[in-house]
Amino acid sequence: MHLLIAAAGSGSRMGADCNKLLLQIEGEPILKWTLESVALASSIKWIGIIGQPCDKHAIMQIVQDFSKPVQWINGGKTRQESVQKGLAALPDEAIHVLIHDGARCLVEPELFDQCAQMVLKGVAIIAATPVVDTIKTVDSNGYISGTPDRSKLWAAQTPQGFSVEQLKEGHATAIAKNWNVTDDASLFEKLAWPVRILESSPSNIKVTTPFDLSIAQSIIAMKRQS
């Protein structure tokens, strides 16, 4: 299975002056923790890291002794554009692909393997967890306009897995129709293509804010102690 890791984000919401994936948890960069899980996922045979050119040296230093083939891919201005560039850089033999946020450093290796197994069966899949809070929709004036049925709400995560051919078609359509999406499953939704949910752990958070970082630090520290 081929894996693309989105690593082109900034540290703006983290309040950092560098790519948040280079911030450290327990003495190791966030991206290193993500890659440790990738290394233990038996299904993953090739990794493409999509990042900004200014971060290439630092990120390639992290993967210099990695046990699996890693390719650097220059990212775009948005996540959507970065994934497009990642798809274009896949080896010719790639038939299926998993997309993962580099900032989801608490991902379990088994989740990659479970997603890969589903994708190889021809199922588009995303990791997700049921929403536990009551969610409100709000109008432009800040007033509540509705309460969606919580039993139908799931928080999307990564990995997300697809047929390479289908995902490329989805991105090509997005360019033609000027669609802007925040994850790849949204392209499938817009095209009325089915995507299945694979329930994952609520701990598979995307480290985006200082609060997220503190949670990740606590969980990794507890894992080390155990």
UniProtKB/Swiss-Prot annotation:
Entry EC number(s): 2.7.7.60
CDD domains attached to this UniProt entry: CDP-ME_synthetase (cd02516)
Any Pfam family: IspD
Top class in the EC scheme: transferase
Gene Ontology molecular function: 2-C-methyl-D-erythritol 4-phosphate cytidylyltransferase activity
Superkingdom of this protein's organism: Bacteria
PROSITE patterns xref list: ISPD
Keyword Nucleus recorded: no
InterPro entries reported for this sequence: IspD, IspD/TarI, IspD/TarI_cytidylyltransf_bact, ISPD_synthase_CS, Nucleotide-diphossugar_trans
Listed pathway(s): Isoprenoid biosynthesis; isopentenyl diphosphate biosynthesis via DXP pathway; isopentenyl diphosphate from 1-deoxy-D-xylulose 5-phosphate: step 2/6
The keyword Nucleotidyltransferase is annotated on this UniProt entry: yes
UniProt site (Positions MEP for the nucleophilic attack): 150, 206
Residues the record marks as site: Transition state stabilizer: 13, 20
Keywords (A to Z) from UniProt: Isoprene biosynthesis, Nucleotidyltransferase, Transferase
Reaction(s) the record says it catalyses: 2-C-methyl-D-erythritol 4-phosphate + CTP + H(+) = 4-CDP-2-C-methyl-D-erythritol + diphosphate
HAMAP family (UniProt xref): IspD
NCBIfam families: ispD (TIGR00453)
UniProt family annotation: Belongs to the IspD/TarI cytidylyltransferase family. IspD subfamily.
Protein name per Swiss-Prot or TrEMBL: 2-C-methyl-D-erythritol 4-phosphate cytidylyltransferase
Taxonomic lineage from the root: Bacteria, Bacillati, Cyanobacteriota, Cyanophyceae, Synechococcales
